[in-house]
C-alpha cells in the first residue's frame, strides 16, 4: 500500500519536530489536504483511546467514557449538526448536544473508508488525538513530549539524520508497504539508536491494521530488534529507554529478552505495541509473535541472524514488516536483490558528526612472514601512538584479532609507553568498571580490543583508532586470522567522530581486505535443525549458501543418526545452548542431567555427573605429536575422531605433554585418556 506520512505524525526529534496540540481555530484555517491528514488519527485513537470505550451522558452532554465520567447511555441519532461551538468543542442539535470526539466515536465504525470522513469527524479525531498526544509540529519545546508514551521525562533532542522529516517519510513508506527493507547508512546517522525508535512510533500509531484505507479490526503485535550479542541488547535498549524519557523498564514500551536475564531487567508491565530487544536465538523461538522484525548488524553474518533472515523470507506473510540494517552493503547487495522478494533499499546519507582523519602506517614485511609481520606491526604501533596520541582524559582503541593478541600487545605497549592500558573483549566481565576508570582518568587511556568493540560498546571519550585490520575467524576445532572486510573497516573507523573529531590509523594495505564467508568455517548443524523446524528447503532457502555442500549433507546425516524426533529437537533448540551438538544425546536422557548440563553451558561449572556423562559420549581425539611452548604450556597436534569433522586436524594446548588420546568435554576442556 502506498502511503505518505503526514507531517502531523512525525516522531518528535526535539530539533525541528515537537509534540503539539492543534486548536480548532488552526483546523479551520487549514487547507483540505492538511485537514484530511487527521483522518489517519482514527487508527491510534481506536487502539489506545476508544478500545472498550462507550457513550456516557455528562452534565447533559453526550461524551465518550474516556472524556468524562457518567452513566452509560444509548447513543443519540446523528444527522448534520445545527450549530458548531468551537469553544466548547460541541455539536449542537435541537434535541441534544454531543462532543466533537463522541460524534467521531459513533461515526468511525468498522469498514468505514477514511477518505469519506467529513469535517465533523475530523474535528473529533483532532480532539482525541490531542488527548493521546500523537500529533507534532515544527514548533514547540522538549517538555511537550512528556507523557506521549507514558514517559515521566521528555524525549531526547536527536539531531541525527535518521530522524529528519525526509528520512521519517521514506522509512514510513517502506514500513507500511510490507516489502522487506534493507536500510544502510554511515556510522553515526542513528541506524540502531533511532530507526527502531521510529518503527516503535509507527507501530504505536498504525501497527496491527491490515490497511490504512479503512477501519478494520486490529491485531496488536510488538516490534522486535534482533541482535547478535547480549551486550548489544543491553546497550541499545538502555539508550532508547532513556531517549524516550523513561528511567525504569516497568511500564515502558521497552523489553529485553536473552538467556539468564536478571530479574531487574524484566519489564513486568510491557506494552503490546512496544519493542523487544532480543538476542537472535531467542528471537527465533517466537518469531511470528512480532509484527515488525528488525535485524541489525547484518554485515556480521552471525549464524542465527542469517537463519532468521531465511526464516522470515520463507514465511514473510506471517510478519508485517522486516527491516535489515547494516553499515554497508559492500558484500551483500547482489545476494539480497535476488534473495528477498521485491526488497526496498533505503540509504540514510550522512557521516559522523565530526571529521575523521585517516593515517596509513605501512608495514614493510609481507603478511606471509607472519611472525616478522607482527613484530614490525607492534613497533609501528608504538611509533603511531607516540605521533598520534589521544589528548589527556581521552582514549584510543587498538583493534587486534584475538584475545591472546590483546594480552600480547598490552604487554608490549606497557613496556614502551607511559599510558594507562586496558583490555576489553566479549569475555571481560567488568567492562563497566573499566570504562569508569577510562572516563575518570586525567591520563591517556589505550584500550586493546578484539572486534567486540566494533559495535558492542560505545566509548564516549575515544578520539583515536589504531586498526591492525585482522579478525580471528573460528572454524570447527580451530580457526584462522584473516584480513577484515570493508564493512568491518567502516565499523571500526566509525567508533570515532561521534563526540569529537577523530583519527583512524590503519596498519594494513587496503588491497588485503576481502569479504569473509563465515558459513564456510562454521558448524552447520543449526542450519539443518532450524530448516527442519521452519520447513526450509536446503540449500535454496538459506541466505548464505555454503561453498562445500558435502559438509551440509554430512551434517544432516550425522544429526539423523542421533535418532531424535523433530519435535524433541525443537524443544532442545528453544531451551538449551547446545554449544556442542553431541550434548543433545544427553539432554534427552533425564531432566536432572539436562538441568546440570544446561548450568554447565551457562556458567562453566562442571559437576562430576556432567563430566562423566560427556565422557560417555566418547568424543575422542588422537594426539599425533606435541612441542613445548613455554613454562606451563605444550602444543599438541591432534586428529578429531568423531562427528562430521572426523579426520580434521586440531591444535590443543595443555599444561603437560600428552600422548595417545584425549576426550573432548567442551571447546576448552579436554581430558587425557588413561593408557592403562
UniProtKB/Swiss-Prot annotation:
Keywords, comma-separated and alphabetical: ATP-binding, Early protein, Helicase, Hydrolase, Late protein, Nucleotide-binding, Transcription, Virion
Compartments in which it is found: Virion
Ranges for domain Helicase ATP-binding: 172-347
SMART domains: DEXDc, HELICc
Induction profile: Expressed both early and late in the viral replicative cycle.
Motif (DEXH box): 296-299
Annotated ATP binding sites: 185-192
GO MF annotation terms: ATP binding; ATP hydrolysis activity; RNA binding; RNA helicase activity
The protein's assembly and partners: Monomer.
Function: NTP-dependent helicase that catalyzes unidirectional unwinding of 3'tailed duplex RNAs and plays an important role during transcription of early mRNAs, presumably by preventing R-loop formation behind the elongating RNA polymerase. Might also play a role in the export of newly synthesized mRNA chains out of the core into the cytoplasm. Required for replication and propagation of viral particles.
Protein family per UniProt: Belongs to the DEAD box helicase family. DEAH subfamily.
UniProt name for this protein: RNA helicase NPH-II
Amino acid at each position: 500500500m502506498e502511503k505518505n506520512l503526514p507531517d502531523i505524525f512525525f516522531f518528535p526529534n526535539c530539533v525541528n519536530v515537537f509534540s503539539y496540540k492543534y486548536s480548532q481555530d488552526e483546523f479551520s484555517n487549514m487547507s483540505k489536504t492538511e485537514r484530511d491528514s487527521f483522518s489517519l488519527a482514527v487508527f491510534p485513537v481506536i487502539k489506545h483511546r476508544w478500545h472498550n470505550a462507550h457513550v456516557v451522558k455528562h452534565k447533559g452532554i453526550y461524551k465518550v467514557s474516556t472524556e468524562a465520567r457518567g452513566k452509560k447511555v444509548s447513543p443519540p441519532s446523528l444527522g448534520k449538526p445545527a450549530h458548531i461551538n468551537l469553544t466548547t468543542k460541541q455539536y449542537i442539535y435541537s434535541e441534544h448536544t454531543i462532543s466533537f470526539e463522541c460524534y467521531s466515536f459513533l461515526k468511525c465504525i468498522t469498514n468505514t473508508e477514511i477518505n469519506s470522513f467529513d469535517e465533523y469527524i475530523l474535528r473529533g479525531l483532532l480532539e482525541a488525538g490531542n488527548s493521546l498526544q500523537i500529533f507534532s509540529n515544527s514548533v514547540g519545546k522538549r517538555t511537550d513530549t512528556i507523557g506521549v508514551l507514558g514517559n515521566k521525562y521528555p524525549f531526547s533532542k536527536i539531531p541525527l539524520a535518521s530522524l529528519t522529516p525526509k528520512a521519517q517519510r521514506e522509512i514510513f513508506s517502506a514500513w507500511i508497504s510490507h516489502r522487506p527493507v534493507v536500510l544502510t547508512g554511515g556510522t553515526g546517522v542513528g541506524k540502531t539508536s533511532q530507526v527502531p525508535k521510529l518503527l516503535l512510533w509507527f507501530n504505536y500509531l498504525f501497527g496491527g491494521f491490515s490497511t490504512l484505507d479503512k477501519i478494520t479490526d486490529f491485531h496488536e503485535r510488538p516490534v522486535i530488534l534482533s541482535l547478535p550479542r547480549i551486550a548489544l541488547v543491553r546497550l541499545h535498549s538502555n539508550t532508547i529507554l532513556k531517549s524516550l524519557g523513561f528511567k525504569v523498564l516497568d511500564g515502558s514500551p521497552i523489553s529485553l529478552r536473552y538467556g539468564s536475564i536478571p530479574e531487574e531487567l524484566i519489564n513486568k508491565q510491557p506494552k503490546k505495541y512496544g519493542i523487544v530487544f532480543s538476542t537472535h536465538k531467542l528471537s527465533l523461538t517466537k518469531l511470528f509473535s512480532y509484527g515488525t522484525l528488525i535485524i541489525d548488524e547484518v554485515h556480521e553474518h552471525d549464524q542465527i541472524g542469517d537463519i532468521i533472515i531465511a526464516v522470515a523470507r520463507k514465511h514473510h506473510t506471517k510478519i508485517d514488516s522486516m527491516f535489515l540494517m547494516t553499515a554497508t552493503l559492500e558484500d551483500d547487495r547482489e545476494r539480497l536483490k535476488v534473495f528477498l522478494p521485491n526488497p526496498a533499499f533505503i540509504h540514510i546519507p550522512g557521516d559522523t558528526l565530526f571529521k575523521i582523519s585517516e593515517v596509513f602506517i605501512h608495514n614493510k614485511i609481507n603478511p606471509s612472514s607472519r611472525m616478522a609481520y607482527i613484530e614490525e606491526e607492534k613497533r609501528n604501533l608504538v611509533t603511531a601512538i607516540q605521533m598520534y596520541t589521544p589528548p589527556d582524559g581521552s582514549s584510543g582503541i587498538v583493534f587486534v584479532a584475538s584475545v591472546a593478541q590483546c594480552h600480547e600487545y598490552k604487554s608490549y605497549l606497557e613496556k614502551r609507553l607511559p599510558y594507562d592500558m586496558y583490555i576489553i573483549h566479549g569475555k571481560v566481565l567488568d567492562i563497566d568498571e573499566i570504562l569508569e576508570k577510562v572516563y575518570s582518568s586525567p591520563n591517556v587511556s589505550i584500550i586493546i580490543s578484539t572486534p567486540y568493540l566494533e559495535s558492542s560498546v560505545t566509548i564516549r571519550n575515544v578520539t583515536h583508532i589504531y586498526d591492525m585490520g585482522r579478525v580471528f575467524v573460528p572454524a570447527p576445532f580451530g580457526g584462522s586470522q584473516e584480513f577484515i572486510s570493508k564493512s568491518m573497516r567502516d565499523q571500526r573507523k566509525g567508533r570515532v567522530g561521534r563526540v569529537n573529531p577523530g583519527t583512524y590509523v590503519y596498519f594494513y594495505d587496503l588491497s588485503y581486505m576481502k569479504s569473509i564467508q563465515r558459513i564456510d568455517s562454521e558448524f552447520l548443524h543449526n542450519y539443518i535443525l532450524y530448516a527442519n523446524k521452519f520447513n526450509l528447503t536446503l540449500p535454496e532457502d538459506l541466505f548464505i549458501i555454503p561453498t562445500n555442500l558435502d559438509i551440509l549433507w554430512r551434517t544432516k546425516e550425522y544429526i539423523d543418526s542421533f535418532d531424535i524426533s523433530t519435535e524433541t529437537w525443537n524443544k532442545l533448540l528453544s531451551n538449551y545452548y547446545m554449544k556442542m551438538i553431541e550434548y543433545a544425546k544427553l539432554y534427552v536422557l533425564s531432566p536432572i542431567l539436562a538441568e546440570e548440563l544446561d548450568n554447565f553451558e551457562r556458567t562453566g561449572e562442571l559437576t562430576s555427573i556432567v563430566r562423566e556423562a560427556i565422557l560417555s559420549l566418547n568424543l575422542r581425539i588422537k594426539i599425533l605429536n606435541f612441542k613445548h611452548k613455554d613454562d606451563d604450556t605444550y602444543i599438541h597436534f591432534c586428529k578429531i575422531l568423531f562427528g562430521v569433522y572426523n579426520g580434521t586436524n586440531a591444535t590443543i594446548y595443555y599444561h603437560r605433554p600428552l600422548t595417545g588420546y584425549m576426550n573432548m568435554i567442551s571447546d576448552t576442556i579436554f581430558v587425557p585418556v588413561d593408557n592403562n
